[in-house]
Structure formats: C-alpha cells, structure tokens
C-alpha cells in the first residue's frame, strides 16, 4: 500500500466546519500527480480542528448538500419534474415550473452550509505495509473508492481505487 498511496500532504482536504462553497473550490482547484499521470480527486478528506480525520465528502455529497430547501422537502418524483423542461430553440421562455432565480438563490443559500452536514464516515483504513489484495477486498466489500492509510494512529496518506485499478492493469 505504501508504494501506491498518495501522501497526505499531496491530497486535498477541508475542515469539518468549512462551507460547501469552500469545498467546491478546493475540489475544483485540486490536481493530483500520480506517477506520470495527472488526476482529479473525487473525494475530499475532512478533518476536525484537532487534525483528526473525521470523514470524507464526495463530489456528489456536495451536490446533494447544495440542493435548495424548497426542493428537498418534495418527493423525488416531484423534484425530477421540476427540471423536466423541454428545450426551447429560441430560449425565449422556460417552463412555468422553472424558476431559475429561485434555484440560484437556493444554491447560494445552501453553499454556506458546513461540510459536516454532508460528511460520510470512514468505514475502514489500511496500514502502509498491507498488501494490495487487502485493499482490493476492502474497496470491493465496502464499496469504497478511497481508503485512508494509517500508521501509528496517524493518517499518512490515502489509497484510491483508480490507482489500485491502474496498478492491477
């Protein structure tokens, strides 16, 4: 695992009380250099103020957290209808159900929410000396795409499924 992990210093992270807006900026600006390949992260690590890893946040968690309140309170099939707008080749009007300004305001309001509202817990970790097949088993059995690497009770890096897959290929 040590040979394939991304060192903690090279991986993007946020604090638990950072805003979703800040998390969007961090994940958008981050680029990882993995061997000779450039790669974009799909997950941010989340730390508390004692520098303990408390969870992760994926891009889709951030997007879910940005959904305006007036949509969240509706059943999923009603939310989908809200965005079921036919394409107007002249773009002169949008559907009566579509209130773009309301959506934009809702997104802006939600962007000030803390990352803590959408955090995902850590389900497992690996040691730097663990074999790659243990990582494969953990990723597959727990449906995880990123696992922290811990040495002496301290996070030293992360292992991503994309890097494991690349190595196996």
Where are the language model's segments positioned?
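Tandem CBS (Bateman) regulatory domains
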Residues: 1-10, 59-123, 136, 140, ...
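Conserved beta-strand scaffold positions in the cores of enzyme catalytic domains, especially
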Residues: 11-13, 123-125, 155
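The conserved cystathionine-beta-synthase
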Residues: 14-41, 63-69, 125-143, 150, ...
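A glycine-centered beta-loop-beta connector
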Residues: 27, 38-60, 139-142, 147-162
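Residue-level detector of functional hotspots within protein domains
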Residues: 30-32, 48, 101-104, 109, ...
């Amino acid at each position: 695992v040590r040979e394939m992990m991304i060192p903690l210093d090279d991986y993007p992270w946020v604090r638990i009380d950072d805003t979703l807006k800040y998390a969007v900026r961090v994940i958008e600006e981050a680029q990882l250099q993995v061997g000779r390949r450039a790669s974009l992260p799909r997950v941010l690590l989340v730390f508390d103020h004692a520098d303990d890893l408390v969870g992760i946040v994926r891009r889709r968690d951030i997007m879910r957290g940005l959904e305006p309140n007036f949509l969240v309170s509706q059943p999923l099939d009603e939310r989908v209808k809200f965005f079921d707008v036919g394409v107007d080749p002249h773009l002169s009007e949008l559907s009566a159900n579509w209130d773009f300004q309301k959506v934009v305001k809702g997104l802006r309001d939600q962007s000030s929410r803390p990352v803590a509202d959408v955090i995902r817990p850590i389900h497992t970790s690996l040691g730097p000396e663990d074999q790659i097949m243990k990582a494969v088993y953990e990723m597959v059995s727990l449906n995880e795409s990123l696992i922290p690497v811990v040495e002496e009770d301290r996070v030293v890096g992360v292992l991503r499924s994309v890097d494991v897959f690349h190595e196996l290929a």
